[in-house]
């Protein structure tokens, strides 16, 4: 490429860095005041960047509206229209898409964020960009969106600027999208083993950092419950329960043999930057201690654990003790 404005980074390996790392390296070498996170399977529609510039301000993150083929469930934050799932299909339908763009413009904005998104470079670097905890990929986007939200950034999605997003590229669907003989697109159960493994790893690290699953409203604005300092004190624990419960708290106590704990740490530590030895069976004075019997843990009880941050927030907890379901909760301090 001979364009003097084009800059690129090449990872010669052997370690896969992924976009969690490489996005930030690209931002670092960018010499423009505004930067954007953009997927390689997106087609920038005419007028899109002009719409970004219309709305960009300090501490504002501007997203374009995605036009997508019906590969994923519909939602109010995007437009489902099929102009092809592969470049070879798209080039035959490109003119049809371009003819549709004027009628798709809505002259409005909504509050949400999804790629492609744009902001001032200073606003990206001031919160240290993406967290390498989630490298090479998965959950790094929700993590940075949460931090934008907590730092008071405003989310703007313009409905006058569009990309056509083919979706389903990269490691999740290594072979791209597929059509059956009837021309219908199918994606279910086609994720690669690599993606499934990394997604599980990143999800567990996201839970350790935030204490809840990824949350957002219907227009993709982040929902960020408070993060409490929580300790689980589990009677009748076992190695499987340790694996299930450890990411959901900051500290966990179980009466387990050292070899069970060591085996878990040996297996799990390679997948996280969190020091697991400082989280398991250590003497600390946690803000919130939750006691329960592992033998009584049901599917419903586990669901309550997954919503613990929201439950504690809605309960307007104070120092003291209370119970719900199988859980006895001691609140020593209330901090988030």
What is each stretch, according to the model?
Residues 98-121:
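A recurrent flexible, glycine/aromatic-enriched loop bordering the glycosyltransferase active site
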Residues 32-43, 286-294:
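Short beta-strand-to-loop acidic/aromatic patch adjacent to the donor-nucleotide binding site
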Residues 112, 116-117, 123-128, 134-162, ...:
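A short, conserved alpha-helix in the catalytic core of glycosyltransferases
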Residues 69, 158-190:
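Active-site donor/metal-binding and catalytic loop motifs
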Residues 42-55, 296-305:
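Acidic donor-binding/catalytic loop of UDP-sugar-dependent glycosyltransferases
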Residues 12-30:
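Glycine-rich, basic loop-to-helix element that forms the pyrophosphate-binding segment
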Residues 47-86:
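Conserved donor NDP-sugar-binding/catalytic core segment of glycosyltransferases
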Residues 1-14, 256:
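Acidic donor-binding segment of Leloir-type glycosyltransferases
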């Amino acid at each position: 490429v001979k364009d003097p404005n084009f800059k690129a980074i090449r990872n010669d390996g052997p370690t896969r860095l992924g976009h969690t790392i490489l996005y930030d390296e690209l931002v670092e070498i960018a010499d423009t005041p505004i930067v954007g996170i953009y997927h390689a399977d997106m087609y920038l529609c005419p007028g899109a960047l002009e719409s970004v510039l219309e709305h960009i301000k300090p501490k504002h993150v501007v997203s374009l509206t995605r036009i997508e083929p019906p590969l994923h469930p519909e939602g109010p934050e995007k437009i489902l229209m099929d102009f092809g799932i592969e470049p070879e299909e798209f080039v035959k339908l490109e003119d049809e898409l371009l003819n549709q763009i004027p009628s798709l413009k809505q002259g409005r904005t909504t509050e949400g964020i999804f790629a492609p998104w744009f902001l001032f470079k200073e606003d990206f670097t001031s919160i240290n960009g993406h967290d390498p905890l989630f490298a090479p990929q998965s959950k790094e986007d929700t993590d940075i969106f949460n931090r934008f939200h907590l730092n008071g950034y405003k989310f703007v999605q313009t409905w006058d600027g569009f990309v056509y997003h083919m979706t389903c590229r990269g490691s999740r669907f290594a072979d791209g999208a597929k059509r059956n003989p009837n021309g219908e697109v199918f994606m279910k159960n086609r994720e690669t083993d690599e993606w499934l493994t990394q997604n599980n790893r990143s999800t567990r690290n996201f839970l350790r950092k935030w204490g809840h699953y990824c949350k957002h409203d219907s227009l993709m604005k982040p929902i960020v419950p408070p993060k409490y300092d929580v300790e689980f004190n589990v009677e009748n624990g076992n190695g499987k329960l340790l694996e299930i419960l450890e990411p959901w708290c900051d500290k966990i106590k179980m009466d387990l043999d050292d070899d069970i704990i060591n085996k878990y740490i040996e297996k799990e530590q390679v997948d996280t930057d969190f020091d697991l030895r400082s989280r398991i069976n250590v003497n600390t004075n946690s803000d919130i201690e939750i006691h329960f019997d592992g033998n009584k843990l049901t599917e419903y009880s586990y669901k309550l654990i997954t919503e613990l941050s929201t439950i504690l927030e809605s309960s307007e907890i104070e120092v003291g003790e209370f119970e719900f379901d199988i859980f006895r909760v001691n609140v020593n301090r209330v901090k988030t």
